[in-house]
């Protein structure tokens, strides 16, 4: 009898372990916008976008983050996709994009569980985007937040909009972050936050 119970327990453990191994997830990584406090303006760097700037990317696999970045002259409006790149980068690259030490950054990580078909679709999208970016990087167009939203919408995590509507609604990372934090609370997703250096004024979520 004890042996049967032991075998049953072992079988259940193997099932749970196998199920957990087959349950992929992504981490949406946010760097908050900020600007130097007045007394540190000579030592702290100014960032593109300032308090409403920052950056966001999707960590799909361990030690690899998908990041939509400018790689040429900035455009005011969209056009040919000749000034940007969709990259699969290391965490070191991602967290250094603002030319500020990682431990000085204010950040939030939102862990989103995926189904296996969603993970396959993400892999397909990112492979295609790395080979050929489907849009340019523009001030009034697609940037990191709108691009990340568009991919999450393709996965069925957020509502899909037209590209124009996406750029208007998700103009900078905070707008995407607020939507995902709402979904995180609703769906019990894991959220990890880190405070930034007190030498800068940081964007808030409320």
Language-model features: where?
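Bacterial Sec-dependent N-terminal signal peptides
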Residues: 1-22
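Secreted/extracellular small peptides and ectodomain modules produced from precursors
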Residues: 10-12, 86, 142
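Glycine-rich catalytic cores of cysteine/serine-nucleophile enzymes that process amide/ester linkages
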Residues: 22-106
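Activation targets extended, charge/polar-rich intrinsically disordered C-terminal tails
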Residues: 23, 36-39, 124-206
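Solvent-exposed, acidic/flexible segments
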Residues: 50-53, 112-115, 119-122, 137-145
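Residues that flank catalytic or metal-binding motifs in active/ligand-binding sites
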Residues: 53-54, 108, 172-176
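Structured domain cores in non-transmembrane regions
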Residues: 94-116, 120-129
């Amino acid at each position: 009898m004890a042996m049967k119970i032991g075998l049953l327990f072992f079988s259940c453990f193997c099932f749970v372990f196998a199920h957990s191994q087959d349950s992929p997830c992504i981490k949406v990584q946010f760097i908050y916008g900020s600007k130097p406090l007045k007394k540190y303006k000579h030592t702290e760097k100014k960032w593109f976008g300032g308090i409403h700037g920052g950056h966001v990317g999707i960590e799909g696999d361990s030690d690899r983050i998908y990041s939509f970045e400018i790689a040429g002259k900035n455009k005011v409006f969209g056009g040919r996709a000749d000034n940007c790149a969709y990259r699969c980068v290391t965490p070191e690259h991602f967290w250094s994009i603002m030319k500020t030490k990682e431990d000085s950054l204010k950040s939030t990580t939102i862990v989103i569980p995926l189904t296996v078909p969603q993970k396959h679709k993400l892999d397909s999208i990112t492979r295609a985007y790395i080979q050929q970016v489907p849009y340019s990087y523009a001030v009034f167009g697609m940037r990191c937040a709108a691009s990340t939203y568009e991919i999450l919408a393709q996965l069925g995590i957020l509502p899909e909009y037209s590209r124009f509507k996406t750029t208007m609604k998700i103009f900078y990372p905070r707008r995407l972050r607020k939507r995902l934090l709402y979904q995180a609370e609703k769906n019990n997703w894991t959220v990890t936050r880190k405070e930034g250096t007190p030498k800068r004024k940081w964007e808030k979520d409320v």
